[in-house]
């Protein structure tokens, strides 16, 4: 990238267009931001089920004057449900957002596609095979259902439903870019102890506890995992992962221009299928390392604060910056409390900020139609049947079909049970301009409704 690249790009683009005007350019980066034209940009999404559920409206506000989008790679490859039904629900919801915005998202594909289970370099893959069998993961059936049920036009629609809050575990942590003095850490009224010194060490002093910076061995180990990351910050964790809901507080000595971070939900995450399988099949305990623990971070920079979450290559803000009143050279009591839905931040007993934990919709839908039919695609993320009240602006025939993918969150296909998760089609009755469809728990549904003939 840079001026030389952009100069050559424009020269090549201009000449190719002169000779082959029918060729469309798909760039793998938003080169148009630097004055380089492209008809389409290839965007990739690899993340957790929750990420896709929370970003179903990702393209709603996309600049329609910019290049079209090719979602070239999209898959759940982090978290607890890779290759399983719940991951397919998240991907299905994201695809519904794409379908609503197909004026700008003109192409989409799952990646990777095929996996020889004896020579695997990546997981999950859409279709798995060995020398004798093949199977599709649950996501395969989502793409099949969506591909077989496309309408001619997207219909304006609205849906309402509950929320699914992002599941979090773990207690507090502390991070700092220089030595940090603290004392009297308390969790739900009892002393909270440091359980994991991920970066740096904690030393007892006459004045309390001193969080020291990482030693050279810790820096080297961390740098080997995340080469691009800052290995100079200390990082220690209180308590265990099952200590999630409650109140944490501790006294922190605030120096002039102090910078430190108070972590919330300091638990290990599953970064890949291979880590998960080592835990499940080999009984290998997940390591406690600074790259694997991803709390929400209450960042304190002097008198300015924000709450952020870990993200590659930068942290994502959950709040705008806000000010707190602290006096340098003194201890101040910092704390938080959470019930799994809200986080409340305190300084010296005074509430500073109340934030909702990120959440996605429990119900997501998209509606398309043809001359003769209405097609409704819907995802129910909830663990209960959802009686969905459907209201249409046209009259429908009573008989309709539902293509359904459902089961338990962790259901997956294997060579022993290759079709444990597979779509089925059932005939139903009772459709009209207003009727109720009971969406099964953890399900993707495609309803095909026949319009009544106009007289």
Where are the predicted features?
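C-terminal beta-strand-rich structural cap/linker in extracellular carbohydrate-active enzymes
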Residues: 420-455
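Short, solvent-exposed beta-strand-to-loop segments that form ligand-recognition rims
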Residues: 348-360
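Secretory/extracellular carbohydrate-interaction modules
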Residues: 215, 219-307
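Short, aromatic/His-centered strand-loop micro-motif at the edge of beta-sheets
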Residues: 310-335
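Carbohydrate-binding surface patches
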Residues: 361-396, 402, 445-446
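Short tryptophan-centered beta-strand motifs in secreted/extracellular beta-sheet-rich domains
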Residues: 250, 331-338, 343-347
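Catalytic cores of secreted or luminal carbohydrate-active enzymes
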Residues: 95, 101, 109, 123-194, ...
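Catalytic-core region of carbohydrate-active enzymes that cleave or remodel glycosidic bonds
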Residues: 10-150, 383
């Amino acid at each position: 990238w840079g001026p030389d690249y952009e100069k050559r790009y424009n020269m090549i683009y201009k000449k190719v267009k002169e000779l082959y005007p029918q060729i469309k350019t798909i760039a793998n980066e938003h080169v148009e931001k630097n004055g380089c034209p492209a008809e389409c940009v290839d965007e990739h999404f690899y993340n957790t089920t929750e990420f896709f559920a929370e970003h179903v409206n990702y393209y709603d506000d996309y600049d329609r004057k910019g290049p079209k989008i090719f979602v070239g790679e999209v898959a759940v490859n982090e978290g607890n449900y890779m290759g399983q039904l719940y991951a397919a629900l998240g991907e299905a919801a994201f695809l519904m957002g794409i379908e609503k915005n197909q004026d700008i998202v003109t192409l989409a594909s799952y990646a990777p596609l095929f996996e020889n289970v004896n020579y695997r370099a990546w997981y999950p893959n859409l279709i798995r095979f060995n020398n004798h069998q093949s199977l599709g993961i649950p996501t395969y059936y989502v793409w099949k259902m969506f591909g077989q049920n496309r309408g001619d036009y997207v219909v304006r629609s609205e849906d309402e439903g509950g929320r699914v809050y992002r599941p979090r575990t773990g207690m507090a942590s502390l991070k700092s870019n220089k030595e940090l003095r603290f004392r009297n850490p308390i969790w739900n009224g009892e002393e909270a102890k440091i359980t994991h010194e991920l970066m740096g060490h904690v030393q007892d002093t006459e004045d309390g506890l001193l969080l020291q910076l990482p030693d050279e061995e810790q820096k080297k180990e961390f740098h080997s995992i995340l080469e691009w990351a800052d290995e100079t910050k200390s990082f220690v964790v209180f308590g265990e992962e099952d200590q999630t809901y409650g109140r944490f507080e501790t006294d922190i000595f605030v120096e002039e221009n102090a910078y430190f971070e108070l972590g919330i939900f300091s638990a290990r995450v599953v970064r890949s299928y291979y880590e998960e399988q080592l835990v499940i099949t080999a009984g290998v305990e997940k390591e406690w390392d600074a790259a694997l623990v991803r709390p929400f971070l209450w960042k304190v920079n002097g008198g300015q604060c924000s709450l952020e979450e870990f993200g590659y290559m930068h942290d994502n803000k959950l709040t705008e910056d806000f000010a707190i009143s602290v006096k340098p050279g003194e201890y101040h009591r910092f704390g938080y409390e959470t019930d799994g839905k809200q986080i409340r931040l305190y300084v010296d007993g005074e509430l500073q900020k109340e934030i909702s934990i990120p959440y996605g919709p429990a119900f997501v839908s998209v509606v398309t139609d043809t001359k003769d039919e209405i097609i409704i695609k819907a995802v129910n993320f909830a663990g209960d049947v959802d009686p969905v009240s459907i209201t249409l602006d046209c009259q429908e025939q009573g008989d309709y079909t539902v293509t359904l993918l459902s089961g338990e969150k962790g259901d997956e296909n294997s060579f022993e049970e290759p079709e444990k998760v597979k779509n089925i089609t059932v005939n139903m009755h009772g459709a009209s301009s207003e009727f109720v469809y009971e969406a099964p728990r953890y399900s993707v549904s495609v309803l095909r409704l026949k319009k009544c003939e106009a007289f």
